[in-house]
Amino acid sequence: MGKGQSKIKNGGSGKPAKAGKPKKGNKNDETTPTSTPTPTPTPTQQNLDNSAQQQQQQQQTTTAAVSLDNKEQQQQQNIPAPATQTPITQTGTPTIEESQKNTDNNNINGASNEASSSPDSPNGSGNGNDDEDEGPEEVIFSKNKQSATKDDFELLNVIGKGSFGKVMQVKKKGEDKIFAMKVLRKDAIIARKQVNHTKSEKTILQCISHPFIVNLHYAFQTKDKLYMVLDFVNGGELFFHLKREGRFSEPRVKIYAAEIVSALDHLHKQDIVYRDLKPENILLDSEGHICITDFGLSKKIETTDGTFTFCGTPEYLAPEVLNGHGHGCAVDWWSLGTLLYEMLTGLPPFYSQNVSTMYQKILNGELKIPTYISPEAKSLLEGLLTREVDKRLGTKGGGEVKQHPWFKNIDWEKLDRKEVEVHFKPKVKSGTDISQIDPVFTQERPMDSLVETSALGDAMGKDTSFEGFTYVADSILKD
């Protein structure tokens, strides 16, 4: 489930067309080229073009009204900001109708638009469907008496919508605790063959605990829906703030980057690759600290060969993903480099409105770093955006990223305790404030709508697909 920006797993360049030439930072800023290694082999131009054309056709028909409104406001204000970013993954092409639904997303509090698929990766290599062919997933059954049901929560506001359902701000009855409840339709998940992705997201979230990763508190189900109760984080998407401000100062980016590095390092130590790092999937809490959400594309790496699924968001795809090579946690460090560049300049480093051109730039393009970026930050970007996986910064573990000179003043223990001073604090009045969430969603009446009986046949017939989905966090059991 996503955000007010397009989140179609098989479509779009990820950025709507802009009027005039896209800007990176201030128009008068000079750039200095920095060479990066050229990978071999590369995908054929024909396959890249085919994949890009499919995505561009999807994007032209699926840009949400809210995204268009945001883009028009950006153009009127002459702000150089990134636009809609579109994840892609290879497991079944969504129809135009499904794609349109995907544009009605708001990535709030871990709301993921679970991976759909596309029939062709750029070079046609890899099975592209590793998450669906692995056989039954081990499920963990809840053995406590404190499992929740939907009747335990009061619905307050709609804070996001997607192709599989919606996300609502809720209050636990009899308590003052506020959560975000993600509601997913089983029939939609089964129809799009996303059962394993959905179960994997829940399993990963219940196994991790980190100050900069959204927490899962409850998971339960009815005969037609799945429910995940997560932290309610109300400081707004990083995307929202970046769009409004154009780019961030380097000291501000450094704190965000350090918190992301800490979270990625934690995931990688458990052999979990995130695979969808981008501004839309990063929320700010009320104090200005980051919170990574949406684990719909995350995967636990079980073999040394890595995974071959062609998935992610075009602007942030690592070269090895485009090449169809097996990939692992190193793809997250490439995406981090892309994200840092975007926060510092306003656009991703290899961005193009033409997807095929963008893919070729990712594979072979020159990395141009503006002169206003410090030498230490430039060095970090060059290390993270190294095309040769074995030479990429972070490949040997998050520790080598933490030891980079740009982070020399970061006290990592204080950082994880959220004791490091942030440079921006969102304007929210309380923990229940929804002012940073798109009113397109918050104006909708909160209700858990019924699923038509005719749509339930397949889902009800496969109800065992979600066996073991129930979960209650240890922190709840200790209360």
Swiss-Prot record:
Biased composition (Polar residues): 102-115
Pfam families reported for this sequence: Pkinase, Pkinase_C
Residues the record marks as active site: D276 (proton acceptor)
Gene induction: The 2.2 kb transcript is probably induced by exogenous cAMP via a cell-surface receptor-mediated signal transduction pathway. The smaller transcript is induced by starvation at the onset of development, with transcript levels peaking at 4-8 hours during the aggregation stage. By 8 hours of development, the larger transcript is induced and peaks at the mound stage (12 hours).
InterPro entries in the record: AGC-kinase_C (IPR000961), Kinase-like_dom_sf (IPR011009), Pkinase_C (IPR017892), Prot_kinase_dom (IPR000719), Protein_kinase_ATP_BS (IPR017441), Ser/Thr_kinase_AS (IPR008271), STKc_AGC (IPR045270)
GO MF term list: ATP binding; cAMP-dependent protein kinase activity; protein serine kinase activity; protein serine/threonine kinase activity
Compartments (UniProt record): Cytoplasm; Cell membrane
Effect after changing T309A: Loss of activity
Keywords from the named record: ATP-binding, cAMP, Cell membrane, Chemotaxis, Cytoplasm, Kinase, Lipoprotein, Membrane, Myristate, Nucleotide-binding, Phosphoprotein, Serine/threonine-protein kinase, Transferase
Loss of function: phenotype: pkgB null cells arrest development at the mound stage, have chemotaxis defects and are defective in morphogenesis and multicellular development. Some mounds are able to round up and become almost spherical. Some of the mounds form an aberrant sorus atop an irregular stalk-like structure without proceeding through the normal intermediate stage and without stalk tube. pkbA-/pkgB-cells exhibit growth defects and show stronger chemotaxis and cell-polarity defects than pkbA- cells. They also move slowly and do not aggregate at lower cell densities at which parental strain aggregate normally.
Boundaries of every Protein kinase domain copy: 153-407
Function: Required for morphogenesis during multicellular development. Phosphorylates talB, gefN, gefS, PI4P 5-kinase and gacQ.
Name by which UniProt lists this protein: Protein kinase 2
Gene behind the chain: pkgB
